[in-house]
């Protein structure tokens, strides 16, 4: 019998379980110790999501059809059909969010009643995050961009144009899933978003744009920028971001073979201001006179700016400008400004290498925010090198999600931190599950301690463990 094709990989909300959707059903594993606790041959499962470690799972077996199933009882709780393909499912103990390309359906998970339908800009990558927390129950997604042109000149028989168009900037809308109101807009990046993640307590939001060089962390819902990290110099597509349960580390995987681990906060665990300059992560304080919570909108939500220059428009630069001062091809400054910016950034870079972090933090606190971010770019605290697969990776399932690799594409990965030890778990699109140890004192390169396959046909990973009631 041929090996099943891998369609979907996801960790549950506390990283204690791993759910895998394949062309021949789905499997659920414990992550510590690694063991298979449930398997089903329900058909071609393109999406699967768990509700913590309970027996409740959400399944997509056909593009527009969602099934909520109790795996312990082997029963279907409910079935829902949508007007277009379901691209993602998010859930916590109070809410279920179903993401379509241009809509998000929000349900009360207690009785599966529809609470709200959110119109969005075209979102083919299903960029959406729902807080695992029931208390801070926030939904984050790209801010819809209204269409500016009107239908006045269109023929009367022509279908109406969509209300929203694809985003051109990386603004994030924060939606309270309990009160069903939009509460803030975080202007996170100049270019469109590629990945967002919310921590377990629903208090932090990590964002990455299509450029993928800068990772930012904001408070939720106020939108204060706390950390800004540099993933790398060259553009890269971010596949996965995940906080550990204590929100002290952030893991990021991308098209490169490197998983980056960033440290959030120092001894004071992320206090803002100059005190954070000595930590591994760059803590960004508000500039004098800057309202860190954003000015409230009169109609629907407040808005928090997070671009490095308060008078720059969202589309006027790239991620490279945000931290290194380098011009983007679309928006190059004058030659004089380019020389001045480059020489000044070089001076700062050399100075920061000579002076200690404490001195840099003190001097940086007197500089404008843009210069402060140039002063001390925050790199990763630790990193992991994913082994290159020698097996050919083919995309044989036409109904599979875009998270799978096709021939010639780089290996894709999903990452999470262990809840009980300083270990990073990495699952790759060729069916490998890796566990790496991280030195929490010195950081540096993590080392591989365990490796498993999630596509094997044998039962050596079977376990008698059961779910929560």
UniProtKB/Swiss-Prot annotation:
Give the start-end ranges of region Disordered.
285-348
Q: Where is the composition biased (Basic and acidic residues)?
A: 297-306
For the motif L/FRRG motif, what are the positions? Answer: 229-233
Query: Which membrane topology describes this protein?
Result: Peripheral membrane protein
Specify the domain of life of the species encoding this protein. Answer: Eukaryota
A Pfam family this chain is assigned to: PROPPIN
Q: Which keywords, in A-to-Z order, does the entry hold?
A: Autophagy, Endosome, Membrane, Protein transport, Repeat, Transport, Vacuole, WD repeat
What does the comment on domains in this protein's record state? The N-terminus might form a beta-propeller domain involved in specific binding to phosphatidylinositol 3,5-bisphosphate (PIP2), leading to the association of the protein to the membrane.
Q: What does this protein do?
A: The PI(3,5)P2 regulatory complex regulates both the synthesis and turnover of phosphatidylinositol 3,5-bisphosphate (PtdIns(3,5)P2). Necessary for proper vacuole morphology. Plays an important role in osmotically-induced vacuole fragmentation. Required for cytoplasm to vacuole transport (Cvt) vesicle formation, pexophagy and starvation-induced autophagy. Involved in correct ATG9 trafficking to the pre-autophagosomal structure. Might also be involved in premeiotic DNA replication.
What is this protein's record name?
Autophagy-related protein 18
Q: Which organism is it from?
A: Pyricularia oryzae (strain 70-15 / ATCC MYA-4617 / FGSC 8958)
Upper lineage is: Eukaryota, Fungi, Dikarya, Ascomycota, Pezizomycotina
């Amino acid at each position: 019998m041929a090996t099943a094709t891998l369609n979907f990989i996801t960790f549950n909300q506390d990283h204690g379980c791993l759910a895998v959707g394949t062309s021949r059903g789905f499997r659920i594993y414990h992550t510590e110790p690694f063991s298979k606790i449930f398997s089903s041959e329900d058909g071609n499962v393109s999406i699967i999501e768990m509700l913590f470690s309970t027996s409740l799972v959400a399944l997509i077996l056909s593009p527009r059809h969602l099934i909520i199933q109790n795996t312990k009882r082997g029963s279907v709780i409910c079935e829902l059909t949508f007007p277009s393909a379901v691209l993602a499912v998010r859930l916590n103990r109070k809410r279920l969010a179903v993401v379509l390309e241009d809509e998000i359906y929000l349900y009360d998970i207690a009785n599966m009643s529809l609470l709200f339908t959110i119109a969005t800009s075209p979102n083919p990558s299903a960029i959406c995050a729902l807080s695992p927390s029931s208390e801070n129950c926030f939904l984050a997604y790209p801010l819809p961009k209204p269409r500016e042109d009107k239908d006045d000149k269109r023929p009367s028989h022509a279908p109406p144009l969509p209300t929203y168009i694809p985003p051109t900037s990386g603004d994030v809308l924060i939606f309270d899933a309990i009160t069903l109101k939009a509460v803030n807009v975080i202007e996170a990046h100049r270019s469109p978003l590629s990945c967002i993640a919310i921590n377990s307590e629903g208090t932090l939001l990590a964002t990455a744009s299509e450029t993928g060089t800068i990772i930012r962390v904001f408070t939720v819902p106020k939108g204060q920028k706390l950390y800004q990290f540099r993933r790398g110099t060259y553009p890269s597509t971010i596949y996965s971001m995940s906080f550990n349960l204590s929100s002290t580390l952030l893991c990021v995987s991308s098209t490169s073979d490197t998983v980056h681990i960033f440290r959030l906060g120092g001894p004071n665990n992320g206090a803002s201001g100059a005190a954070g300059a000595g930590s591994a992560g760059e803590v960004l304080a508000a500039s004098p006179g800057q309202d860190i919570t954003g000015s409230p909108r009169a109609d629907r939500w407040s808005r928090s700016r997070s671009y490095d220059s308060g008078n720059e428009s969202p589309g006027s630069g790239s991620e490279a400008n945000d931290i290194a001062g380098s011009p983007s091809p679309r928006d190059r400054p004058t030659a004089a400004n380019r020389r001045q910016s480059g020489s000044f950034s070089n001076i700062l870079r050399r100075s920061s290498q000579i002076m200690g972090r404490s001195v840099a933090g003190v001097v940086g606190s007197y500089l404008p925010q843009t210069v402060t971010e140039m002063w001390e770019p925050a790199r990763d605290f630790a990193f992991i090198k994913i082994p290159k697969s020698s097996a050919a990776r083919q995309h044989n399932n036409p109904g599979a999600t875009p998270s799978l690799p096709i021939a010639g594409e780089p290996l894709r990965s999903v990452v999470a931190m262990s809840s009980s030890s300083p270990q990073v778990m990495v699952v790759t699109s060729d069916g490998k599950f890796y566990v790496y140890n991280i030195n929490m004192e010195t950081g540096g390169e993590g080392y591989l301690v365990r490796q498993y396959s999630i596509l094997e046909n044998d039962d050596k990973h079977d376990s008698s463990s059961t779910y929560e009631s």
